[in-house]
């Protein structure tokens, strides 16, 4: 058994007050144990490159796995099946990933990207990215988790990771993405790690096709602020 943890951090600079929300998974199978073992062997220099069973690892397999999952959604969309990608990260710059997302959008995949910082992708461009939305949520607290979701024909593939979709993270660092396999936990991560941010109608800035961000006033009576919701659940 191996426990893999990814921390979600809320940090208020003025008061130096930190709230840490740990997103963790206990991987209860032999192949996952071996995956973690091989990662630590690599870090200590006692093993070479080994293809892992469940974990994605930079700089070896993470990029190719991301590309393949994006392409799978595109194939499903072209076949008339439901296709969906939701991803949350701090930065999106890697050219191949961006091009694959454009191709997936042209194939009909609905893509929602929650990118806190720099994003080189342009959503809503006619003939290229009409099916892509990009939002940035910059509130009082720093959020540091990355979540990748692929509909995968109804299998709901979900990974938690340390890696932004940038060249440095995917090719020049050792980073890991691990799957959430339990259906109950998977549904909870989708709800608390992704959907809560997509529902945010008060602090989200929406990227336009020219790269400008617009904060549209909400017409809803209820103001939904994702960080307030999360603090209500996990804060003190």
Predicted feature locations:
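PLD/PLD-like phosphodiesterase catalytic module centered on the HKD motif
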Residues: 47-51, 59-236
């Amino acid at each position: 058994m191996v426990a893999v943890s990814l921390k979600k951090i809320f940090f208020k600079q003025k008061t130096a007050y930190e709230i840490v929300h740990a997103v963790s998974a206990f991987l209860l199978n032999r192949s996952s144990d071996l995956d973690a073992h091989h990662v630590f062997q690599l870090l200590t220099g006692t093993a070479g490159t080994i293809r892992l069973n469940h974990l994605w690892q930079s700089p070896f397999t993470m990029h190719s796995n991301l590309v393949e999952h994006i392409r799978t959604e595109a194939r499903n969309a072209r076949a008339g099946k439901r296709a969906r990608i939701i991803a949350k990260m701090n930065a999106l710059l890697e050219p191949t990933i961006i091009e694959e997302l454009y191709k997936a959008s042209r194939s009909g995949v609905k893509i929602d990207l929650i990118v806190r910082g720099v994003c080189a992708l342009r959503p809503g461009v006619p003939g290229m990215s009409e099916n892509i939305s990009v939002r940035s949520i910059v509130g009082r607290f720093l959020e540091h988790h990355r979540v990748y979701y692929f509909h995968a024909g109804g299998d709901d593939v979900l990974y938690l990771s340390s890696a932004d979709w940038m060249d440095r993270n995917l090719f020049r660092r050792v980073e890991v993405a691990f799957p959430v396999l339990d259906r109950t936990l998977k549904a909870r991560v989708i709800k608390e790690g992704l959907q809560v941010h997509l529902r945010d109608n008060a602090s989200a800035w929406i990227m336009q096709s020219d790269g400008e961000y617009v904060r549209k006033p909400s017409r809803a009576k209820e103001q939904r602020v994702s960080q307030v919701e999360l603090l209500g659940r996990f804060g003190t």
